[in-house]
A protein has these predicted regions:
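Long C-terminal interaction/binding lobes of large macromolecular proteins
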Residues: 1-248
Length: 248
């Protein structure tokens, strides 16, 4: 994994601002794993993608994740603190390859499928109604479906086979849809909440970018330096100049 500089992070943020979250994720992965290649990264399963994003998040902002969620029982705000390594492991080089298609059979149905990836999310788009998006995703990920010796399409699958397909996908790629188990310290209500890795990471990147650009503005205003000169400074030197300006 490549270490990303401040200027690289700014470029990624600017390039991905306002884009589909799947596109934002690919911008980050392409910058951090250039040796893998954009085509290969785009074909990684969503669980593989999320684990790489968590690893990158640890490089950029540290391993500790903090958030606040509202308790559905008492309405109190519950603070969460967790480690990225508690959510997923550290992927090795073999992990950086798309997974082969999977197979299961039930009754006289034989189902071959692959796992959803970033290209699927980009093709479906962010604004589709949930049922339409799910059906489109299943259609894209269904490699081959047969009833006996007859090939059938995804919309011909019985509901129980469709449910089995969704369950098989979830079991094969558990980090694709990360759920955090939470217990409220105020009322002891237990529930689960989804953790959207790219949403959280991009929000952090945006907050960092605004803080960093504020520092650039401060240094440029005080010393008349160009943005490129400020970005070329080491983080320690930038902070030293900022401390001088602020008198700390």
């Amino acid at each position: 994994m490549k270490t990303l500089s401040a200027s690289a992070c700014l470029a990624i943020w600017e390039r991905g601002a306002g884009h589909h979250p799947a596109r934002q994720a690919l911008h980050l992965l392409n910058a951090a794993w250039p040796e893998v290649g954009p085509d290969m990264l785009a074909q990684l399963s969503l669980g593989q993608r999320n684990l790489l994003l968590l690893r990158l998040r640890e490089q950029l902002f540290g391993s500790q994740i903090e958030s606040v969620v509202g308790c559905p029982g008492c309405g109190q705000q519950v603070e969460l603190t967790l480690d990225v390594r508690d959510i997923g492991g550290q992927p090795d080089q073999e992990f950086l390859e798309p997974k082969a298609p999977y197979f299961f059979s039930q009754g006289d149905y034989q189902i071959h499928f692959r796992l959803p990836n970033s290209l699927d999310l980009l093709a479906i788009g962010p604004d589709q109604e949930a049922t339409i998006a799910r059906n489109a995703l299943l259609a894209r990920c269904l490699v081959l479906a047969q009833q006996g010796d007859q090939t059938i399409s995804s919309d011909q699958l019985p509901l129980e086979i469709e449910a089995q397909l969704i369950d098989q996908m979830a079991q094969a790629d558990p980090q694709a849809d990360i759920e955090l188990a939470i217990t409220c310290p105020f009322c002891a209500r237990a529930w689960q909440v989804g953790f959207d890795v790219i949403h959280y990471l991009w929000r952090e990147l945006t907050a960092w970018a605004y803080r960093f650009l504020g520092d650039v503005h401060t240094l440029a205003s005080e010393y008349g330096w160009a943005e490129g000169d400020i970005l070329a400074l080491s983080p320690w030197r930038r902070q030293a100049y900022l401390a001088i300006i602020r008198g700390t």
